[in-house]
From Swiss-Prot:
Source organism superkingdom: Bacteria
Protein task: Participates actively in the response to hyperosmotic and heat shock by preventing the aggregation of stress-denatured proteins, in association with DnaK and GrpE. It is the nucleotide exchange factor for DnaK and may function as a thermosensor. Unfolded proteins bind initially to DnaJ; upon interaction with the DnaJ-bound protein, DnaK hydrolyzes its bound ATP, resulting in the formation of a stable complex. GrpE releases ADP from DnaK; ATP binding to DnaK triggers the release of the substrate protein, thus completing the reaction cycle.
Transmembrane feature ranges: none
UniProtKB keywords: Chaperone, Cytoplasm, Stress response
Predominant localisation class: cytoplasm
Localization: Cytoplasm
Cross-referenced Gene3D superfamilies: 3.90.20.20, Head domain of nucleotide exchange factor GrpE
GO molecular function: adenyl-nucleotide exchange factor activity; protein homodimerization activity; protein-folding chaperone binding; unfolded protein binding
Name listed for the protein in its UniProt record: Protein GrpE
Source lineage: Bacteria, Pseudomonadati, Pseudomonadota, Betaproteobacteria, Burkholderiales
Any one GO cellular component localisation term in the record: cytosol
Region (Disordered): 1-26
């Protein structure tokens, strides 16, 4: 902080202070201009702060809507799959409600039910993994239960023990297989 200055005597002693009223006018004009600049800068800062708050609120709204969309997709995805399975359950219940059916009638009913279930799987992107003998072992789709010496190259599927399933491109359950350990 600067030391207080002594008041300037406003009585003209000589010609030096004769320009003081013009200097005061210049300083007053400069002060007014600086005040106007300050007010403009403060208004700009306030506007930018409001913009930041609006942007933050918009980002929060986008995040919330995205969460709601994910929740709805999950809910309705499950709903679609459930709707596909209802006819399968209906067929099984109808088969059980029939008294004294012959073995052939039961077999035909089970085949129809299996077709309905397969169609439900296909509609919901659920696909079977059923590697054939001689296929190359894929650790992303298969799970080797055992490895046995064989005439096949190593890591070749020898036997399918249980089918696997993928849903959309994600393995739901790997196929259980026996693989070749190579020639032993």
């Amino acid at each position: 902080m600067t030391a207080p200055q002594e008041p300037v005597d406003s009585t003209p002693e000589s010609g030096e202070n004769a320009a003081t009223p013009g200097l005061e006018d210049d300083l007053s004009a400069e002060l007014a201009a600086l005040r106007a600049e300050l007010e403009a800068a403060q208004a700009t800062v306030k506007a930018q702060q409001e913009q930041v708050l609006r942007a933050a609120a918009e980002a929060e709204n986008v995040r919330r809507r995205a969460q709601e969309d994910v929740a709805k997709a999950r809910k309705f995805g499950i709903e679609s799959f459930a709707e596909s399975l209802v006819p399968v359950k209906d067929s099984l219940e109808a088969a059980l409600a029939q008294p004294d059916q012959a073995a052939q009638a039961w077999r035909e009913g089970v085949e129809v039910t299996l077709k309905q279930l397969t169609a439900a799987f296909e509609r919901n992107l659920l696909k079977e993994i059923a590697p054939a003998q001689g296929d190359k072992f894929d650790p992303h789709l298969h799970q080797a239960i055992s490895s046995v010496p064989a005439d096949q190259p190593a890591n070749t599927v020898l036997q399918l023990l249980q089918k696997g399933y993928v849903i959309a491109d994600r393995t739901l359950r790997p196929a259980l297989v026996v693989v070749s350990a190579g020639q032993g």
